[in-house]
Curated annotation (Swiss-Prot):
Gene that this sequence comes from: rplY
Family label: Belongs to the bacterial ribosomal protein bL25 family. CTC subfamily.
Gene3D superfamilies the record matches: Ribosomal protein L25, beta domain, Ribosomal Protein L25, Chain P
Protein's name in the database: Large ribosomal subunit protein bL25
Gene Ontology MF term list: 5S rRNA binding; structural constituent of ribosome
Keyword Amino-acid biosynthesis: no
GO CC, alphabetical: cytosolic large ribosomal subunit
The keyword NAD belongs to this UniProt entry's keyword annotation: no
Entry keywords, A to Z: Ribonucleoprotein, Ribosomal protein, RNA-binding, rRNA-binding
NCBIfam families referenced in this protein's UniProt entry, alphabetically: bL25_bact_ctc, PRK05618.1-2, PRK05618.1-5, PRK05943.1
Lineage: superkingdom: Bacteria
Alphabetized HAMAP family for the sequence: Ribosomal_bL25, Ribosomal_bL25_CTC
InterPro entries recorded: Rbsml_bL25/Gln-tRNA_synth_N, Ribosomal_bL25/Gln-tRNA_synth, Ribosomal_bL25_b-dom, Ribosomal_bL25_C, Ribosomal_bL25_long, Ribosomal_bL25_short, Ribosomal_L25_dom, Ribosomal_uL5_bac-type
Any single biological process term in GO: translation
Length: 190
């Protein structure tokens, strides 16, 4: 899914200026990367808030329009208000289509309900890590990675090497020869 966000350069910076922006329905943010100086920006709160609720937004290639120019960006970080449903700040990183990006991608468990551990042994599959850090070209970044648990039995430990990565996507940990555990399979307590 493609996301498009309108942004404007913000001149005033600091706590007071950020509060005024938020009262006007805007979010202070920053755009950096691609060999450019960081640019202080403001984006519409409603657009970003509802987009952040979608898991795919966090790994999507976003078209950010700034001063009539469109840049390809990814969300690098964001801060939420401690108790209100309000985004406080967002960081965008500009990316180039031909340069790999390092990003954390969500991990999904699939076929666990069909596994011997769950069906026959009354067990469950528990994720130890909900995301996996990968390196890929911006166009190849997956929305999520699947961990197939169809063949697991109670007591199994699933590692990064058990994840089938799409073509053009590499695990950062596997490149360093670190085959980390990502999920465990437990049997029913007796």
């Amino acid at each position: 899914m493609t996301y498009e966000i309108q942004a404007s350069v913000r001149e005033a910076q600091g706590t007071g200026a950020s509060r005024r922006l938020r009262r006007e329905g805007q979010i202070p943010g920053i755009l950096y990367g691609e060999g450019q100086e960081p640019v202080a920006i403001a984006v519409d709160h409603k657009t970003v808030f509802y987009a952040l609720e979608k898991e795919s937004f966090h790994t999507a290639l976003i078209k950010l329009s700034l001063n009539g120019e469109t840049k390809d960006v990814i969300v690098r970080d964001f801060q939420m208000h401690p108790f209100r449903r309000e985004v406080q700040h967002i960081d965008f990183q500009a990316v180039k289509a031909d340069q790999p990006v390092r990003i954390r991608v969500p991990l999904h468990i699939v076929n666990a309900e069909n596994s011997q551990a769950v069906k026959l042994q009354g067990g469950r599959v528990s994720l130890l890590n909900t995301t996996v850090e990968v390196v890929a070209l911006p166009a190849n970044i997956p929305a999520f990675l699947d961990l197939d648990c169809a063949e697991v039995v109670a007591g199994d430990i699933l590692h990064l090497s058990d994840i089938k990565l799409p073509e053009g996507v590499e695990s950062v940990s596997l490149k360093r020869n670190e085959n980390l555990a990502v999920a465990t399979v437990t049997g029913k307590k007796r």
